[in-house]
Amino acid sequence: MGLSLAAYAGAALAEIAGCFAVWAWWRLGASALWLVPGALSLGAFAWLLALTPVEAAGRSYAVYGGVYVAASLLWLWAVEGVRPDRWDMGGAALVLAGAAVILWAPRG
């Protein structure tokens, strides 16, 4: 379980950072050099997501979706300086609950 959570959290950080590098270049006028660490970060994202001990890729991606939503809101607050509102937090709680059901449901 610890490896799963660490892999999902690391994947979220890597994907969000990689996508933000593209956002910074495309939307904020940052140097195209931002694309280099962005691409490396997106590669790390894929590698970390493949480390999860879930038996099916689609199920792993579904669980990751919940983690991604929550991590994106943390990024919004920590990096962009925009505090998530109660609707953001409620939505994150819902998707995390769904991700937990998918990840920890007893399967035969």
Swiss-Prot record:
Protein name per Swiss-Prot or TrEMBL: UPF0060 membrane protein Rsph17029_0436
Cellular component GO terms held in the UniProt record: plasma membrane
SUPFAM superfamilies: Multidrug resistance efflux transporter EmrE
Family: Belongs to the UPF0060 family.
InterPro entries: UPF0060 (IPR003844)
Keywords: Cell inner membrane, Cell membrane, Membrane, Transmembrane, Transmembrane helix
Locations listed in the record: Cell inner membrane
Major place of residence: membrane
Membrane topology listed for this record: Multi-pass membrane protein
Membrane spanning stretches: 5-25, 32-52, 62-82, 86-106
